[in-house]
Amino acid sequence: MMDVSSMYGNHPHHHHPHANAYDGYSTTTASAANASSYFAPQQHQPHLQLQQQQQHQHLQQPQQHLTYNGYESSSPGNYYPQQQAQLTPPPTSSHQVVQQHQQQQQAQQQQLYPHSHLFSPSAAEYGITTSTTTGNPGTPLHPSSHSPADSYYESDSVHSYYATAAVATVAPPSNSSPITAANASATSNTQQQQQQAAIISSENGMMYTNLDCMYPTAQAQAPVHGYAGQIEEKYAAVLHASYAPGMVLEDQDPMMQQATQSQMWHHQQHLAGSYALDAMDSLGMHAHMHHGLPHGHLGNLANNPHQQQPQVQQQQQQPHQQPQHPQNQSPAAHQQHHQNSVSPNGGMNRQQRGGVISPGSSTSSSTSASNGAHPASTQSKSPNHSSSIPTYKWMQLKRNVPKPQAPSYLPAPKLPASGIASMHDYQMNGQLDMCRGGGGGGSGVGNGPVGVGGNGSPGIGGVLSVQNSLIMANSAAAAGSAHPNGMGVGLGSGSGLSSCSLSSNTNNSGRTNFTNKQLTELEKEFHFNRYLTRARRIEIANTLQLNETQVKIWFQNRRMKQKKRVKEGLIPADILTQHSTSVISEKPPQQQQPQPPELQLKSQGSDLGGNELATGAPSTPTTAMTLTAPTSKQS
């Protein structure tokens, strides 16, 4: 760190980081106590304090992680311009308020000072506790952290790295982050940082490369913890999609550091409600992130680091998060935590601050804006945070649903084109009407999906309906309601048929138009059984995607037609008897064994053949059927 501080010109502060630089930031313990008060002032006096703090942080973060400071410093110049927001976010947890301000100010400062590495602030903001955690919260960390972190961070490549691999870079800062909150865990963090420092120092060049290369790995882990914010900080635009990887990168090497950082971030976040609030204030999103991401993930991150690195304060502050991150306490878990907090330049801060100031290039504005915008973004981007932020997961689900459904829907339009043109036309064009006409339940459900299916454009609502309809269609009882969904979705399976059948079967006039497939199956069944048991009727209705009532009425009409034909002498009377007998005798076996399969396969084959073939087996439920359907249908 000495080198780093001298490198960054912060070494004067760097030497007295505990006492001077970090009142709340400098000494982890003090930072824990002072974090909120210090950060609040920092927030208010961001530039001077941020500069001082950042310098102090740099000084201290030379302790805590000069690595990070170097990192941050390096990255700020390079990275900050690109990822000022990202840099700013790093101080999410304990520095969040202060660091967010610091980072924001750092972003400004770094704007002021191209070489943010000169200020540890970025490092500090990034939770550049790497150094600190590595050594004592004080200077000891600087050297060990400093060498690895220093080299690691000193390199302007770090800038690039941060810009590119800010996440990885952040890892070392993760311990830096603990500067404030992690100083309690500074020793652990320091130790981790020392480990990290060695790793970083050895990987100084590598870190940039490895971390970048490792991003995918980190990404995997990071997403779990919603490190998207971290990486997003760094890779806001670049890694926004692949935020996690950067985190892993950090994690792998600086994973402990990251853990520390997350400790720090979490610690400070949780340490001082004011931090969270301040951070929130500074980053409109901190509270939100803290809420959704930070609490769950930052807390976890911080927690894990806390647990790993005995940060009583952080642990106390983040007890609820500790349970979550004990798993993270393992190196891998730590990595995840690190990913969260450190990911990109303190991705954790990002997340905590802005969730992910992922896009946010400028930490301060991006952090606030990104925090506001990215909390959802981060959470949504990090499905892992979905637990913390149900909205995200659910948002993603929504997004995902349409995509899968969209294919189904798109195929639905194809369905009309397929062999069952009439039915599918109904489905596509008349599905809404059909659905309306179809079952009452089906009509309600069907209308939404049908609209979607009919339009051929999957609406989210339509998609959701479709999914529901798929489920319903799959359910025998839901034949009516399923059909609408099936219609909308154009589910290849019975669902689609049911909706098609319902739609096809139900004209605006109220008359049901049966598809050839449906008629074939009904005739086949009628051939064996003129009278259906209710169970069989339900089975057939489900298979053909019809309502029980439709099947019942069809059989009634068919029997009347048969009787009429016999009466007219068109059909031998014995046929009726044979029919009856055969039906009676065969009814149980065929209904139970051959017919159901046949009906299902054929009916589905027909309907699916029509629907599904048209759909191209887009629907999941129909996939199996689709294979069958194409075979039966096409064959």
UniProtKB/Swiss-Prot annotation:
Biased composition regions of type Polar residues, renumbered to the chain: 341-352, 376-389
Disulphide bond pairs: none
Alphabetical list of SUPFAM superfamilies matching this protein: Homeodomain-like
Low complexity bias locations: 39-66, 95-111, 129-139, 295-340, 358-373, 585-604, 617-635
PROSITE patterns reported in the protein's UniProt record: HOMEOBOX_1, HOMEOBOX_2
Cellular component per GO, a single term: nucleus
Gene Ontology biological process terms from the UniProt entry: brain development; brain segmentation; cell differentiation; cell fate determination; head morphogenesis; midgut development; positive regulation of transcription by RNA polymerase II; regulation of transcription by RNA polymerase II
Name of protein: Homeotic protein labial
Organism for this UniProt entry: Drosophila melanogaster
Gene name per UniProt: lab
